[in-house]
A protein has these predicted regions:
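Substrate-binding/catalytic cleft of secreted carbohydrate-active enzymes
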Residues: 1-196, 213-223
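Non-catalytic, glycine-rich low-complexity segments
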Residues: 169, 181-234, 238-239, 310, ...
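Short, solvent-exposed loop/linker segments at the N-terminal edge
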Residues: 223-229, 327-338
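Beta-strand-rich binding/interaction modules
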Residues: 230-256, 293-298, 354
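Beta-strand-rich structural segments
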Residues: 235-237, 336-353
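Aromatic sugar-binding surface patches on proteins
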Residues: 261-282
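Short, aromatic- and glycine-rich surface loops/edge beta-strands on solvent-exposed regions
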Residues: 285-302, 342
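Edge beta-strands of extracellular beta-sandwich domains
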Residues: 302-314
Length: 354
């Protein structure tokens, strides 16, 4: 219950101890709580303070499956069963070069990659309205960038005592201490998805299950088919095979997922040199705009189980409105509210992004 601040006055530690007790009492019966971080986050505190915080958690939650953690380089780390660090499996990534195979490790937060802590420029921080190229870079950065950095693929290549990590952060939000919002979310502040959302969605199992949330196979084309779009087409999918078609009855490209035991379940798929705006222009001049498309088909056991089709947005002619309620209806109690999303679209409903 604190961040980057320590005071040597005894009263400060006593108040923190009280906060820790109240924190555990408040949340100890929540089924989603797996691990406690009772220490002051990113703070240079004394050794005896760390020992006391661990003891307080154990007192308030005296059960065998009570786990507490702190940073692997912090004072008093020897008192904690879980240590926070970044993967260091290859000796290059930012992590603990002296990782002990007898200790459980966890990456408390990963993903951010700022140039400095004043400017806050980062390939992870991308506003949704910046368009497809920045969003593609963000998704690639989170998945498996060309440079050495903690990413989803790296977390899948750790020894088994490194049990995972948490992305920073799920949604864009205001922070208060910087003029820019934090743009590192998989969705924007209005919970509208960026490409990174679909990249992570592709990591789920393709098996269809009876659950309260969406399951099963998926495929998504991260390409807007604009005059500024890349010739390379990026696709996210959890299927065994993806078939991409450019133009109706046109060129077909095929991707087969590699059979590997290491790394992220569904790597980012790139179909090189597929899209050509000049072909779009040629077909449009022939009044054949309906034949200009990208069609992705996800296959499992040779059968198509998921599809996604993208068309270029033409002349803007209407507004689309939809309720973003995730299937939960409004309750007329005077306090409920819901998000209504508005979009500019052509006559066929293709949203005009640029």
């Amino acid at each position: 219950p604190g961040w980057q601040f320590w005071n040597d006055a005894p009263e400060f530690a006593r108040r923190v101890y009280s906060d820790i007790r109240n924190l555990v009492r408040r949340d100890r019966n929540h089924a989603c709580v797996w691990l406690w971080e009772p220490i002051l986050n990113e703070t240079w505190y004394p050794d005896d303070f760390a020992k006391k915080t661990r003891e307080l958690v154990d007192q308030e939650y005296p059960y065998p499956y009570c786990y507490s953690g702190c940073d692997s380089g912090a004072r008093g780390k020897e008192y904690f069963p879980v240590l926070f660090t970044h993967p260091s499996f290859d000796g290059k990534a930012w992590g603990d070069p002296n990782a002990d195979p007898k200790i459980t490790y966890f990456t408390r937060e990963w993903g951010d990659n700022v140039d400095d802590w004043s400017s806050h420029n980062s390939p992870s921080r991308v506003a949704r309205n910046w368009g497809e190229q920045p969003m593609l870079i963000q998704a690639r950065h989170y998945a498996n960038p060309t440079y050495t950095y903690t990413c989803y693929d790296a977390l899948y290549r750790t020894p088994r005592q490194h049990v995972g990590g948490c992305l920073w952060h799920s949604f864009d939000h205001q922070r208060g201490y910087h003029p820019d919002p934090f743009y590192g979310g998989l969705m924007d502040v209005f919970r509208q998805p960026k490409y990174s959302y679909y990249m992570f969605k592709a990591q789920r199992s393709p098996e269809k299950q009876e659950r309260l949330f969406e399951t099963g196979p998926m495929v998504y084309i991260a390409h807007e088919m604009t005059p500024f779009s890349s010739k390379d087409v990026t696709v996210y999918s959890n299927c065994e095979e993806v078939r991409l078609t450019f133009m109706r009855d046109g060129k077909v490209s095929t991707y087969s997922k590699p059979l590997t035991e290491a790394g992220m379940p569904s790597p980012v798929i790139t179909f090189p040199d597929v899209y050509d705006f000049q072909m779009d222009k040629a077909m449009s001049r022939k009044k054949k705009q309906e034949d200009v498309l990208l069609l992705a088909e996800g296959l499992i056991d040779g059968k198509v189980v998921a599809t996604h089709e993208v068309h270029p947005a033409r002349r803007p002619e209407k507004l689309l409105l939809w309720v973003d309620n995730e299937g939960v209806n409004l309750k007329a109690d005077g306090s409920d509210f819901v998000t209504v999303v508005a979009a500019v679209a052509d006559k066929n409903g293709n949203i005009k992004r640029l």
